[in-house]
Amino acid sequence: MSVILSNRLYLPYSPQLAEKIKAELTYTIPARRRGARPTVFKDFFKIRDTLSIPIGRQDFIPEGSELIDKRVDIPADIPEILYTLRPSQQEAVNLINDNYVINAIPGYGKTVTALALVSKLKQKTLIIVHTVALRDQWIREVQKILGIEPGIIGSGKYETDKDIVIANIQSLYKHSDDLKSKFGMVVTDECHHAPARTFKEVLDKLKSRYKLGLSGTLIRKDGRHVYMLDYITPFDIYVPQEENILKPEIVIFPTDFPISDSGLIPWANKITALTSIPNYNIIIKRIAEAEAKKGHKVLCVSDRIQFLEALGEGIANSLVVTGMYKERSDLERRLSDDIDIIFGSISIFKEGISLNALSCLILATPINNDAMLTQLIGRIQRKHEGKLNPIVIDLQYKGKTAKRQQASRLNLYYSKEYKIHTLNND
């Protein structure tokens, strides 16, 4: 019995194996709206007398099978890293010799660990990211950590001749057929995006011998995390012990601002109503300025651009970041010099911009997503010389919906063993 390993696994058909695969690779994703039907996703199909399943599900290979490995192995002259790894990073590099996922909170150093693995395995490598900001950040890290220039796919460039190529997924998608056999290793940054159609289809075409996923959270609010690792491996996941990070203190800030409990009003409209209250704007500004005066470097986040722009008005030592910022190094310099407060969009700061000096996170609009909240808190947990112990300002609102969301966030804080205290604003 022969099993082919390529972009996917190709196994000889048998009714018993087909039933087992159907049972395990049929995923029911609960509906997010009340009354809506769940989504059923199947990631297997039959081609004549062959069953095709994702490459990560090698647990379905029958014992005693002959393995025919058609994955591509493309040796490359990757230099040693110009960096000293911390113990848990070195542990990951020593451990990983095959498809793997590194699940570590922001501050661990997933980028340098991944590049150390690229150096170890010495394969022509494709690094996949989902934003231009992340792509540019990886370019700088490859230059700094390995001392070489990577190729770029995106922004009008299609440079596939370099030993390391960095591509944003939107540009990669249209070239996936051409690229499927050109890389011996693929690194997927923020691999929890893999269930997205473009990510999934690209990963499913690549025949790379080694696949490495990086993530700060393996949970998705939409429930699709149940199958996302099938394209890399759902079994070999490295979760390092927490090091090089600071545990934040959670400050619950009670307010009298209401959030409607009406099921007829869309959530987006409820948040728009909240951020349109003039006094709410004033309170957020005062909190940010007060924490900055204590010596904190403040990150105040929301998903409302106009709200963030309004918050930044009249505060001399602040900066509004709601889109791609030209250079992370410039942001770091300004935080050291003249900027104490950043009013930033959640979409930008949950992934992609890491500024070690940040020490205070203000949740300027409520968050009901544990994965997103974990990512945002990670932005203030990195160690940095002269940095105050990090704090999270979590505003408390009136209403049953607000209380349920607050309880969900508290559960996350307790699970992380964060110190929590509530201000008395009487």
Where are these regions (language model features)?
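Walker A/P-loop
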Residues: D98-L121, L126
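Conserved helix/coil segment N-terminal to the catalytic DExD/H
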Residues: S155-M185, A196-E201, I348
